[in-house]
């Protein structure tokens, strides 16, 4: 292969939520509560803003993110990017549309772990980013639906939307929580990081086709690695291919330029930071 240029820097945004992320929805509508006609109207506006801003800011790739599901990625992929007529309707400007069609999108599933870490016992958000080579059906059936969560008195259920809704309904009946069944269920559902790793590693479809990462707000260079949560933290960070952080001290800790061998021994690899 011949190449006439060296490295190319491209701007990627790995973590863009859609309106289906009802745990963190700042878009003014809930897709699960609208008719299909109203949802199409509202989602058209979301897609227009998403891709127009991406082009304006020269973003080359976007990680379409939702909690415990693929609904946003699925809708964007199937009803927009795979539909020339829909793309023409939303983006009549030919030049803009061509630029949008060159943007690389990939699914980012945000999960909440059942583990708590840190002085304040914070829950851990855990991202599994898949290659867009993996089909939506494979991710749903062979990854999401293979995970389980605690439902009631030691009973577990598969991680499906219908089961999450049932969990929410049960919690509302017992505790008078407000919100839709799905919202309440999503607020309470958690999964196990060892189970995630097992499902990914045991299915050859996913081999070398995913990245694991966690967002890190705190300064990892200052935390106590002798605490009770050491084993949990170590195992989670060891699974990660990279970290989502802008904390300069954490970045320095993760890159470990002054203790590379020790970092690799303890955490499996040097951790690039996004």
Model-predicted regions and their roles:
Residues 226-269:
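Extended hydrophobic/aromatic segments used for targeting, binding, or gating
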């Amino acid at each position: 292969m011949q190449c006439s240029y060296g490295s190319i820097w491209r701007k990627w945004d790995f973590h863009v939520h859609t309106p289906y992320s009802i745990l963190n929805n700042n878009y003014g509508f809930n897709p699960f509560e609208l008719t299909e006609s109203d949802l199409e109207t509202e989602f058209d506006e979301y897609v227009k803003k998403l891709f127009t801003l991406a082009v304006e800011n020269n973003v080359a790739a976007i990680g379409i993110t939702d909690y415990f599901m693929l609904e946003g990625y699925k809708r964007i992929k199937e009803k927009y990017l795979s539909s020339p007529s829909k793309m023409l309707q939303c983006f009549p400007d030919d030049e803009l549309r061509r630029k949008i069609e060159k943007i690389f999108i990939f699914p980012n599933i945000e999960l909440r772990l059942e583990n708590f870490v840190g002085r304040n016992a914070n829950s851990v958000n855990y991202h599994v980013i898949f290659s867009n080579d993996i089909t939506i059906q494979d991710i749903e059936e062979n990854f999401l639906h293979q995970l389980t969560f605690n439902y009631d008195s030691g009973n577990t259920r598969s991680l499906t939307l219908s089961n999450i809704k049932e969990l929410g309904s049960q919690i509302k009946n017992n505790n008078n929580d407000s919100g839709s069944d799905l919202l309440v269920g999503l607020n309470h559902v958690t999964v196990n990081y060892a189970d995630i790793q097992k499902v990914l590693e045991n299915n050859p479809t996913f081999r070398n086709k995913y990245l694991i990462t966690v967002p890190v707000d705190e300064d990892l260079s200052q935390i106590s690695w002798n605490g009770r949560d050491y084993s949990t933290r170590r195992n989670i960070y060891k699974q990660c291919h990279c970290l989502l952080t802008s904390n300069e001290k954490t970045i320095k800790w993760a890159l470990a330029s002054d203790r590379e061998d020790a970092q690799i021994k303890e955490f499996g690899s040097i951790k690039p930071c996004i």
